[in-house]
Amino acid sequence: MADLDAVLKCWGAVEADFNTVGGLVLARLFKDHPETQKLFPKFAGITGDIAGNAAVAAHGATVLKKLGELLKAKGNHAAIIKPLANSHAKQHKIPINNFKLITEALAHVLHEKAGLDAAGQTALRNVMGIVIADLEANYKELGFTG
């Protein structure tokens, strides 16, 4: 619970500007792992200022709002995880490793924009590790090994 509290302490900076932070997180993900951009067909041709692209920022905001919902559930997130896993496995076909990659992008952006220190970044990785493990368990139930 201490890890979750550490992450939630800086979450206000995310909520203050979901679009900007979301755009930065996805831009960081695509920069560090260019292959991930191909998983988002509507972003495939976007180059240049990815973070400033309205569609990328809007999708990043959607991702962060859902993550905020998961965080605020404080571990009681089965009802949130199940449909998320279902859509990401069946519809979007997102390999589980990509959730680890976006966690690293988020840690980097939160360090820069919200002052998340090394301990906070470790807390974020720990919290996301639990979320990702639960997503992966749902993926397995669905027979998705991506």
From Swiss-Prot:
The keyword DNA-binding does not apply. Its main location: cytoplasm. Keywords: Cytoplasm, Heme, Iron, Metal-binding, Muscle protein, Oxidoreductase, Oxygen transport, Transport. Pfam families: Globin (PF00042). Its EC number is 1.7.-.-, 1.11.1.-. It catalyses: Fe(III)-heme b-[protein] + nitric oxide + H2O = Fe(II)-heme b-[protein] + nitrite + 2 H(+); H2O2 + AH2 = A + 2 H2O. GO terms for biological process: removal of superoxide radicals. It is an enzyme of class 1 (oxidoreductase). GO terms for molecular function: heme binding; metal ion binding; nitrite reductase activity; oxygen binding; oxygen carrier activity; peroxidase activity. Nitrite binds at H59. It is found in: Cytoplasm, Sarcoplasm. GO terms for cellular component: extracellular exosome; sarcoplasm. InterPro entries: Globin (IPR000971), Globin-like_sf (IPR009050), Myoglobin (IPR002335). Heme b binds at H88. Residues 2-140 form the Globin domain. O2 binds at H59. Gene3D superfamilies: 6.10.140.2100, 6.10.140.2110. Monomeric. Monomeric heme protein which primary function is to store oxygen and facilitate its diffusion within muscle tissues. Reversibly binds oxygen through a pentacoordinated heme iron and enables its timely and efficient release as needed during periods of heightened demand. Depending on the oxidative conditions of tissues and cells, and in addition to its ability to bind oxygen, it also has a nitrite reductase activity whereby it regulates the production of bioactive nitric oxide. Belongs to the globin family. This is Myoglobin. The lineage of its organism: Eukaryota, Metazoa, Chordata, Craniata, Vertebrata.
